[in-house]
Every structure is written in C-alpha cells, then in structure tokens.
C-alpha cells in the first residue's frame, strides 16, 4: 500500500472523527447560545457548566431502541440516514481546512483531495444529500414524514439552483473552481477578499446555504409546530443520530467554504496565523447560524419559494451579467 493511500485513509479517519465530535459539541454550544438569547441557563446540571450533557445525550441516543415502523420500506428507511452521512463527509474532500504544514519532515496537505473542480464537487456531492430526506419521508409510511419529504423536494432543489448560480460570479473573478486556488487568489491581504468584490454573491450564497442546511428560518422540512419532526418523525436511536450529525457536518463544511471563498480562507489575517484565522472565520459563521435561529421566526413555504424564484434568482442572474461586463471592460 502506497504512502499516498495510507495518508488519505488517515485523513479520512481524522476528518470523520473530528467533525463527528464537533457535531456533538455544537449542540451544547447551540443550546447555550439559544438559552442566552432567551434569558435561560441552558445545560448546567451534567458536569461542570453542563459540559457532560453532550456525553449524556450521546449515551441516551445511541442506546435507544432502533424502531422501524410497520409498513415502512426497511431497506430505504435504513439507507436514507447513510446517504445523509456519506454526502456530508464526502463533500468535505476538496476543502483545504488549514495551510500546508510539515510533520516529521513530511509535508502534510490538510485536505483529502486537491481536485481542480473542488467547488463544483462540494456543491454536487452536497446536493446528493437531498435524496436522504426525500427517501426517508417516502419510506416511513407516515403522513408527516411524507409532507416533510415533499417540502425537501421543493426547498432543497430550488435553493440548489440559486446557490449554484450565485457562486458563478465569484468563480468568474477568480477563474478557477479549485478551493485552493480561490484561497490563493485572496492571499494579497484584507482588501483582496472576495466579499468586497462580490458582496451580493456573499449575501445570496449565505441565505441559500441556510435554506440548504435546513436551518431556521428555513427549517420547513422538520418544522415541529406543523409536521412534528418532518421526514425524521419515525426515526429513533442511531439512525436519527446519523441525520443529526450529517446536518451539523454540513453546517461546518459550509462555514469553512464561505470562509475560504469570501473571507480569505487560511491566509494570514494581520498578525493572526492562517490556521487560527480560518478557525475564527468558520466559527463565526457557525455562531451566526445559531444567532439567526434565535432571532428570526419561521417562514411559510410560499414565502420561501417567492423569495427564491422572484428575488434571489433574478439577483443572482443580474450579478453574473454585471460581473461579466466588468471583467470584459
């Protein structure tokens, strides 16, 4: 077995382990953030400052009985959470999380695969995760799950179109689909960040990302007040945990991608080293998603579709046209 294969396997194991752990810890942070906004304490009883609440929740979750409803398609019911997990972690393959570094005289690239269509790969594999809620709802033999599945179809597919068109303008400026090249393009300093050259693209992509991640105010797929838990209604134990981990893995992936594409990535930020800089940026966008959840109410499905097709899509197309004209001039 070649050194490259061994290195890649080690990277995959580290990536899955780290982001699975971060997904669990993010629930603690989110509960604390929401509690602060609502003037509550949040988790505080299990361990110091409630830090062991994550472990307690994990033990409770993974020791629950795994129930498959009567009349459900067992194969597809089991396959759906696997698709969610696989798409979430595979989409991280082209993301450069840190600058290259040397370990025991060997240069380490902190990404799994530096492909020249990295951004396209990220969007395409992430979009494959759409099949998870669709299949889960169809296979569950539950009306609430089916409604969540229908909402997944219209919401995720619609915003996949918007996010893809939105990102075309920044890619036209850079001239590359590689996330590594996009990061290098902004290496000149603070003023080279694409957020200053493509502010509209940043805002549109951020909103579309929240819709694709099923985050509030766009969590129509599992809106508790309307459809119980949506496509997850019949899931319990390990399978439900896989959906939950996939959602947070997607959140971290999008936070890193937004940091790389619009905010200079892992380039040094003044006196702050690049590795620490990208952690600060990605952490901010994770916190921002929690802030939005605590602040904004849910939107109706018709409002969401109107915003997608009547506002965001025309703005994304207009941004592409204006960017093309500026480049030609």
Curated annotation (Swiss-Prot):
Q: Where in the cell is it found?
A: Cell inner membrane
Which Pfam families does the record cross-reference, listed alphabetically?
A: NADHdh (PF00146)
Top class in the EC scheme = translocase
GO cellular component terms attached to this protein's record: plasma membrane
Q: Which InterPro entries match?
A: NADH_UbQ_OxRdtase_su1/FPO (IPR001694), NADH_UbQ_OxRdtase_su1_CS (IPR018086)
Q: Which residues form a coiled coil?
A: none
Under catalytic activity, the entry for this protein gives: a quinone + NADH + 5 H(+)(in) = a quinol + NAD(+) + 4 H(+)(out)
- UniProt topology in membrane: Multi-pass membrane protein
Transmembrane annotation, as ranges: 9-29, 42-62, 75-95, 117-137, 154-174, 188-208, 238-258, 269-291, 309-329
Q: Name one GO molecular function term.
A: oxidoreductase activity, acting on NAD(P)H, quinone or similar compound as acceptor
Q: What is its main location?
A: membrane
Q: Which UniProt keywords apply?
A: Cell inner membrane, Cell membrane, Membrane, NAD, Quinone, Translocase, Transmembrane, Transmembrane helix, Ubiquinone
- What does the record give as EC number? 7.1.1.-
What PROSITE patterns does the database record attribute to this sequence?
A: COMPLEX1_ND1_1
GO annotation, biological process:
aerobic respiration
Q: What does this protein do?
A: NDH-1 shuttles electrons from NADH, via FMN and iron-sulfur (Fe-S) centers, to quinones in the respiratory chain. The immediate electron acceptor for the enzyme in this species is believed to be ubiquinone. Couples the redox reaction to proton translocation (for every two electrons transferred, four hydrogen ions are translocated across the cytoplasmic membrane), and thus conserves the redox energy in a proton gradient. This subunit may bind ubiquinone.
Q: Which PANTHER family match?
A: NADH DEHYDROGENASE SUBUNIT 1, NADH-UBIQUINONE OXIDOREDUCTASE CHAIN 1
Summarize subunit and interaction data from the UniProt record for this chain: NDH-1 is composed of 14 different subunits. Subunits NuoA, H, J, K, L, M, N constitute the membrane sector of the complex.
Q: Which family does it belong to?
A: Belongs to the complex I subunit 1 family.
Could you identify this protein by its name? NADH-quinone oxidoreductase subunit H
Encoding gene (name): nuoH
